[in-house]
Amino acid sequence: MTELHLEARHLVMIEQMLQEFIPEARVWCFGSRVHGRGLKRFSDLDLVVRDEEDLHAKLGKLRDAFEASDLPIKVDLLEWNQLPDWLKQEIFEEYVVLQEPAKAAI
């Protein structure tokens, strides 16, 4: 598994917000926080939501939560279905699964 270049306490905050707002979604991290090239202390965190369901309203609330949080970095939250093919290919080359969809209780 590829290491995620992020402080553990920040990762916990991000995972908690993902679970609160979009527990049903698969979320991948990509970019400099994954591969480490060009990484700076305050580099943003690139996340992509890989879900066929329309989560636009929930993602807006999640974006607001990220902005209002105590995270010292910016979180860019993208939707897979809106990405160009070249960026999808770039993400496929190196990513970290941050969240898998929550399973419904049986």
Placement of each model-derived feature along the sequence:
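Short, well-ordered beta-strand segments
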Residues: 46-48
